[in-house]
Amino acid sequence: MLDQTKTRSDDSAPIQTSPRKRYIKTKAGFLMVLRHRDDVLGCLAQLAETEKLASASFVGMGFVHRATFGFYDFVKKAFDPKTFYDAELASMTGTIAWQNGKPSIHAHGVVSDASFAAVGGHVLELEVGTGSLEITITAHDQRLEREIDPGIQANILGL
């Protein structure tokens, strides 16, 4: 079963967005390679701001030290979070849009452990573990905005 306990002494150190550029431009968008302790969602937001992305879709895989997933409770109108440690990010997919002038990252993912047990859900936080995490970002021409749907209090992508 996936580890839900802290296993490293360096866990109290803050995760970080990379001080150096960890991506290259491609014909369709960007290829990003993140390294140990990088904040995946923060790095994607930083890319969106730096490169002035209108919107984008992305897929990724790699190794994570910490993955926090949330399952949205429509009664409480909030995510129920669960954190897992030291796992393979078997798959991640998501979108980059804008909300209140800032990048809004929406991602879902699946992580697995050495016994191939897997869990997944809405990504609330991802910290890269030992090794790397690779993300292919496909840029879109149209700027997309995310807004809170008042009925369910959840962020919804507008077209």
What residue spans do the PLM features occupy?
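N-terminal intrinsically disordered, cationic/polar leader segments
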Residues: 2-105, 110-159
